[in-house]
């Protein structure tokens, strides 16, 4: 899928005359995941996929260094980048396992500017690091999906599927050491708290894997036989939970996050009820802003230095076809130059929302 997406997007870019030919920035992405399909979640691969497409279209030299889910290797990559005789212009990194401050320190000798995506530096960490462009002046910005509001909408869709039954919810989020796990879980707890009579039976931490999702859900469904809603913080764990529900013959609705191909097929077949998608675009949106920054347009003037992008999209059987027309096997290419103020000087504000994207491509 990666090579096909890149071929289509690159061909489309070549077919459309560019309206700008700015400076070509060099960007290194310190990916916490792995390039191996069996070792990295589909969302991680898709994020790199769309960053590669965006870089090719915009005119960015992108290099990806994979850490294989080892935060110490991620820090060593940062140290190696800082020691380069020819440093990149920008380094994009993820606060996976709370490692961003260590990478800030590792990259301090480098003139490269730093941009955090996906998993933000937490408020607690910021008491030591300060905010963007303060203690670390070359840390120029951050952008992350608004996971809390996105999960709130996802659980609302699961609730709608329950009909009149009162919510008896179970939740499986990611590792405690990863800030995004708690952000996603907060969407579940916020929604349950907003509904009179709803109850969250238990929320547990997982390791993002389908096997762990199955194990956790199997135990929880046995412990809470009245549970009727299972939320998981990614599609892999959701698929495992769905298998556990089938094994228990439990009448539950199950939702995940990521837009994984198997999850979409499961929704079409009446298995999963919903998934929350769009995380795979956060790196591409960051590259749009960095390209503009490299060419004299500072994104800080439009949305600030620390951005929570509330664009995540709930997919159910109702809107599955529309979503697959854009991101499925027969996807239409996204032209990321349309979102750049360098390529489109008429843009007054960045708009990274999902609805216009779907409308434009369908």
Regions found by a protein language model. Name each.
Residues 106-148, 263-266:
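Flexible loop/hinge segments that line or gate small-molecule binding clefts
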Residues 1-12:
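N-terminal secretory signal peptides and thylakoid transit peptides that target proteins
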Residues 172, 285-362:
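Hinge/cleft segment of the Venus flytrap/periplasmic-binding protein
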Residues 68, 73-128, 237:
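Beta-alpha junction/loop-to-helix N-cap segments that form part of ligand/metal-binding clefts
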Residues 74, 135, 140-168, 259, ...:
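Hydrophobic alpha-helical segments within soluble ligand-binding/sensing domains
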Residues 25-50, 54, 63-76, 94-98, ...:
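Extracytoplasmic "Venus flytrap"
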Residues 85-95, 113-118, 170-171, 203, ...:
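Periplasmic-binding protein-like
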Residues 114-127, 231-273, 281:
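Venus flytrap/periplasmic-binding-protein-like
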């Amino acid at each position: 899928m990666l090579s096909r997406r890149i071929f289509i997007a690159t061909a489309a870019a070549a077919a459309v005359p560019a309206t700008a030919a700015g400076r070509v920035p060099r960007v290194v992405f310190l990916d916490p995941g792995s390039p191996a399909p069996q070792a990295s979640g589909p969302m991680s691969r898709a994020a790199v996929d769309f960053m590669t497409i965006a870089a090719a279209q915009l005119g960015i030299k992108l290099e990806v260094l994979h850490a294989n889910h080892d935060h110490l290797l991620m820090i060593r990559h940062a140290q190696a980048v800082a020691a380069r005789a020819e440093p990149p212009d920008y380094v994009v990194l993820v606060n996976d396992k709370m490692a961003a401050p260590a990478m800030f320190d590792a990259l301090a000798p480098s003139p490269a500017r730093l941009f955090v995506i996906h998993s933000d530096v937490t408020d607690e960490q910021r008491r030591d690091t300060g905010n963007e462009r303060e203690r670390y002046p070359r840390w120029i910005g951050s952008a992350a999906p608004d996971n809390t509001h996105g999960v709130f909408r996802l659980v609302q869709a699961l609730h709608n599927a329950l009909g009149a039954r009162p919510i008896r919810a179970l939740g499986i989020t990611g590792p405690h050491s990863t800030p995004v796990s708690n952000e996603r879980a907060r969407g579940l707890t916020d929604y349950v708290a907003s509904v009179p009579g709803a109850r969250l039976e238990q929320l547990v931490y997982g390791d993002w894997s389908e096997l762990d999702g199955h194990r956790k859900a199997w135990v929880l469904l046995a412990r809470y036989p009245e549970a009727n809603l299972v939320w998981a913080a990614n599609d892999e764990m959701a698929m495992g939970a769905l298998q556990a529900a089938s094994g228990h013959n439990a009448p539950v609705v199950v939702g995940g996050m990521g837009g994984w191909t198997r999850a979409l097929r499961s929704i079409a077949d009446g298995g999963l009820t919903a998934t929350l998608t769009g995380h795979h675009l956060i790196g591409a949106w960051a590259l749009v802003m960095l390209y503009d920054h490299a060419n004299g347009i500072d994104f800080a003037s439009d949305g600030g230095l620390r951005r929570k992008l509330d664009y995540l999209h709930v997919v159910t059987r109702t809107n599955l076809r529309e979503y697959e027309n854009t991101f499925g096997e027969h996807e239409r290419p996204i032209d990321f130059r349309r979102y750049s103020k360098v390529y489109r000087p008429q843009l007054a504000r960045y708009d990274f929302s999902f609805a216009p994207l779907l409308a434009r491509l369908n």
